[in-house]
Structures are given as structure tokens and as C-alpha cells.
Amino acid sequence: MAGKTAEAIVRTKGNTYPGTILPEKSRRAGSPRSKPAARIRRRVDWRGWVFMGPFVVVFVFVFVVPVVYAVYLSFFQQRMVGGTVFAGLANYRRLVADTHFWQSVSRVALFTLVQVPVMLFLAAVLALAIDSMKLHGMKFFRITTFLPYAVPAVVSTLIWGFVYGSKYGLVGSVNSLLGTQWDVFNPRVLLAAIGNINTWEYTGYNMLIFYSALSVIPHSLYEAAAIDGASEWQIIRKIKLPELRGSLAITVIFSIIGSFQLFNEPSILQNMVPGNAITTDYTPNMYAYTLSFTGNQSTYAAALAIVMAAITMAIAYTVQISSLKNTMK
């Protein structure tokens, strides 16, 4: 046959006629590929943006705008004469030399180093105990362990404040019974007393995270380990604990952030503790609150808040990177 030809399928009104021979030139001319790209119009699907729009609006106005405004305020100073004036990095230079600020930071850092490991250890033990399925009344035990987290922090602190009272609380009753003179509000042990309140409040929450991670482990692994003669401790050490790495990283990050934001407990106990054991700069958040609402230094408080946010983010990011490296090993 003269010229290049190709077998094609001619479609007319929905009917197909196989075997029809068309010249290659004609076939190419009728091909959809010959249409210019400009004629192909892609419709933009806006449904995803419609669903995401409310979240973006709330996120911008609740998170982005306050952070940007705090950064903006931190570059100004409030003066008796002249009002609010631009000061550049003066607030940050003042903060570096502020001993009250660094004392409060060191206090919450010590609080974090002691309280967070103790709390997470107790939460892991409770999660392993519930996951063992050997406890009587397991559902009741799980609910009662989580219940303190449902109690508002203000109420929890007030309850523990009355328990700690050496004259009117449980500690006072024990002192009268045993003839002792325990004082939980002593400045030397006050930080540990606050840590006990936080541990009581958040152990159940972290326990639930650990228990959720344990509950997704296939039971076939336990059965295979039992057939191989593994003991309960070996199952915990070789199967359960490695599965807690991901949830452990999450709980550590959340706990560090919460510890550096310590405010409710010392602020409420301040009026219950005799003397001046809890000062207005006991924690960074209390110091920022005092500067902003009592000392009329909101711009300096904004600089303090920005620095604390940077410190907390750096620590949380370090923990996350370390966790990812351990997971990839």
C-alpha cells in the first residue's frame, strides 16, 4: 500500500467500526494530542480550601497574630515621660542581665529534670500493669487513674493546699497524731510539693497515651514469645518497651512544655503558703504576669515571653530530633 498507513478505529455517534484504514497523516490530525495545550482548561477544585478555610482563619487570629504582636511589642518600652517608644533590643539586653528571670528559669528547669521522669515512669508502670490484663477491676482502675486529669488545675491545687496545711490539713493531723513537725510548705521542699501536685494531675493522661500504644501491638507477638519460652519481663523488655518509643517522645515534649509553663499551682498556693516562700517571680510565667499586669511593663513581659518560647521550642526540637535518631537505628 502506497504511503504510510495505520489501522484506526472510526467512532461515529457512539458506534465503533474496527478494521478501517486511515492514512497516518489524517489519523494524527484527528488525534487529541494535536490540540494546543491552551485549549485544555483545568478546573480548580475549591472544596478542600472550603473545609480548611475555617481552621486557617482561627489559626491565624489565635496563634500567628498574637505571636507577631508580642514580637512587635518586645521592641518597645513604656516610659513615664514620652509614653511607648521604640527601644530596639533594649528589653532583650535587660533580660540577659535580669537575675530574677534566670533564677525562675533555673527553678523550672530543676522542676522539669526531676518531675517529668518520675511522672512518665509512673505512667509507664501503670500502662504496663493495665495492659497485662491481670488486674481485678481493670476498667475501674483505668478510670480512677485518669480522673485527676479531668479535675481543673485550680481545684486540684486547692485540694492539695488544704492537704498540705500543717495547722488545718492532713499534714497537720498527722503531726498532731505522731508528734512531728512536718511542714510541706517549707521553701526547701515546696518545689517538690508542687511537683507532686503536677504528677497527680497528669500521670493518668500520660498513662492513657502509653496504654494506647501498647494496645495496638499484635497479640501474635506475645504468643510467639511465649512459645519460645520468654518470661513476662522479657516480653516487656523486648516487645512492649520498644513500642513505647514514639509515644514516649510525645509525652516528653508535652511534659517539658507544660513544666516550663508552670503557673497555676504556685500562683494559687502563693496565698496559702506562710511567709514569702512563693515570690512573684517564682516561675517565668508568674514573672511575666507580674510585669504585665502589676508592674505596667507589658513590653518587657513580651520580650520575656518570646525568650521563654524560644527556649522551650529549642528543647522540644532537640528531644524530637533525638527521638527520630533513636527510632531510625
Question: Which residues are covered by each model-predicted region?
Answer:
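Transmembrane alpha-helical segments of polytopic membrane transport and secretion proteins
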Residues: 1-52, 135-139, 320-329
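A structural signal for multi-pass alpha-helical bundles of membrane permease subunits
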Residues: 44-329
